[in-house]
Amino acid sequence: MIDRILDKLGIELNDMQQDAMQAVLHTDRDVVVLSPTGSGKTLAYLLPLSQLIDAGDDEPQAIVVTPGRELALQSATVLKNMGSGLRAMACYGGRATMDEHRVMKQVRPQIVFGTPGRLNDHLDKGNLNRYHIRYLVI
């Protein structure tokens, strides 16, 4: 599946992406990747997540914490463009939490991208079921 996604996106993985992806897929340990902006960290975590997430489960299984709204939206778009079939949602300030919750119930995202404050709001209000979360990307 990963090869199909890479072909679809027209991307060849660099060494950092390959190493990070293999570490996530084949160990039960936390993985830390430090790399400059634009080096492919988003794909380095989304490709393994596309293999690890249960597409048949309608509950959020991964939370991706982003520093700002733009990166939350961009990351959700990258996941969509991958064609993995996984559902995602970007959560960020500047719009009503209640509106996001309504969309969340409709979309039933398996991966939730969001800013720290907005994710905390949804967790505090019980809008985001944390009991199925298996992966956290910061």
Name every feature range the model reports, one short phrase each.
Residues 11-15, 43-44, 95:
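Conserved phosphate-coordination/catalytic loops
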